[in-house]
Amino acid sequence: MSNTPIELKGSSFTLSVVHLHEAEPEVIRQALEDKIAQAPAFLKHAPVVINVSGLESPVNWPELHKIVTSTGLRIIGVSGCKDTSLKVEIDRMGLPLLTEGKEKAVRPAPVEPATPSEPPQNANPITKTRLIDVPVRSGQRIYAPQCDLIVTSHVSAGAELIADGNIHVYGMMRGRALAGASGDREAQIFCTHLTAELVSIAGVYWLSDKIPAEFYGKAARLRLADNALTVQPLN
C-alpha cells in the first residue's frame, strides 16, 4: 500500500475529436445525431474533444455546448481555439482548453556554438512499431501510441486495436481497428481476413455492414481518399 494518499501518473487515452465547421446549433445537432445513430454502441455517451478551429463566424458557446451535450456526448475539453473572448466563455464553463500535438508551438532555443560530440552509445532507439504475436481476445484493448501496430494472430469480436499509425492484422480480424487515432489521415489498415466490427481511420469509420461484400472475409487494405474510407484488395 502506498504511503501517500494520491499519486500522479502520466497516461494516454484515445478520444474522438469533433471538428466543427458550422456554428449553427441545429445543424450541428442533426449531424451529431446522424453520426451517433450509425454507431450507437461506439458513440453513445462517448467522451469527446470539440475542435473549433474551423469556425469563422461568431460562436454562441453556451448554446453550442447545450446542443452537443443534448445528444449524449460528453465534452471533456476544447481544442483549436484562438479567439480570446471564446476562450473566456469556455473557461467560464469549467472546460479545459487543450493544445493538440500538431498545433503545439515551440519557441526555438538560441543556438550556441558547440563542439561536435559522439552520439551516446546507450541511447534507446525510437519505437517504430508495436508487435503483438498472441491472439487478442474479446474485451482486450491494444494501443500503439505514436507508432504502427502489427498483430500476427487473430483478433476476436469485442477486442479493440488502436494505433496512431497504421494497423496490420495477419490473422482473422473480427474486432475493431482504429488507425490514425491522433488524426493522421495518411494511416492505413491492412487485414488478411477482414471481418471487423468497425474500422476507423482518423475518426472516419465503417461498421461491419458498410464493408463492401466483395471484401468481407478477404485480404484488404483500407485508407482515406477525399475524406472517405476506401478499400481495395491486399496484394
Curated annotation (Swiss-Prot):
Organism: Salmonella enteritidis PT4 (strain P125109)
Full protein name: Probable septum site-determining protein MinC
Physiological role: Cell division inhibitor that blocks the formation of polar Z ring septums. Rapidly oscillates between the poles of the cell to destabilize FtsZ filaments that have formed before they mature into polar Z rings. Prevents FtsZ polymerization.
Cystine crosslinks: none
Family to which the UniProt record says this protein belongs: Belongs to the MinC family.
A single GO BP: regulation of cell division
Assembly and interaction partners: Interacts with MinD and FtsZ.
InterPro entries in the cross-refs: CAP/MinC_C (IPR016098), MinC (IPR013033), MinC_C_sf (IPR036145), MinC_N (IPR007874), Septum_form_inhib_MinC_C (IPR005526)
Stretches with biased composition (Pro residues): 110-119
Domain of life: Bacteria
Organism classification: Bacteria, Pseudomonadati, Pseudomonadota, Gammaproteobacteria, Enterobacterales
